[in-house]
Amino acid sequence: LDPVVIDYDRDVLPLTPAGNATERHMVVAYLAAVRRTVSDQTAFWAEKLHRSRDEIDGILNNGPKIQNLVRATLMKRGGVGYVQPSPETFPSVEEVNHVITACGALPCATWLDGTSAGEQAEEELLELLIGKGVVALNIVPDRNWNIADPEVKRTKLLELYKIVDLARHLDLPLNVGTEMNAPGNRLVDDFAAPELGPVREAFMDSAAFIYGHTAMQRALGLGYGSAWAHAHFPTRKARNVFYTQAGRIIPPGKAGTARLKAISAASTETDPRVVLARLIEGQ
């Protein structure tokens, strides 16, 4: 990107909440540097990204689109900033899942849209990941129904329905939604969309499960991965049922926290049926 230069400490780190810079922060820093130092931004980006002036002109003032183009061209596979990972680049799946569980969280598998070669063997992949500690599956439904091309939409909707059915078969609750990692993403998914009708119940059940686990872990340390949960629910399916029930009972916000904390501190020895009964009594 010569002659544009950025300084990591000066230009990138101030964009982060806690010094945890990602490639997106670097893209924003470069875009800002170009605005400060280049008189013809369109010409600059057209040359560096190997695009036409018209294409750059059409997105230059659209933050998410120009950011995504810069990131995809320079930082993804084939780009000058891409480094091919090796087996030593990242910790193992088992190590990551152990850390996640130790934090009281839920190790999740991820699913894109069902069209890649790997996701065509999704059952085999999920069974492998379950063996490594995964207990839930993350889905971004917008990718599979909010699509302009009718044929692509039809194909991806079928893949969505298939993965939800497979998750049910494998006792994997769903963590559904769009991560807030880029401007323009949905804040809340439209579960009322007709296309999501066949999977809405599974999504809502899973939302109750995620909330039930989160609330009980935060207030009592009795989340899905706790020793208490494993002692009382030897199977993932039984744990799923309990935390889904709890999630439907516990009110949101401070009221839910207060109701949970009213349960005896000795609740590590409490029968789950007693926990649910006490939660219901507090309604």
Whereabouts are the PLM-identified features?
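Charged catalytic cores and adjacent phosphate/nucleic-acid-binding surfaces used
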Residues: N61-T73, G79-Q283
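Non-catalytic, alpha-helical, charged scaffold/linker segments
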Residues: L1-K48, P252
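Short catalytic-site patches enriched in acidic/histidine residues
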Residues: T42-A46, R51-D57, V70, G81-P87
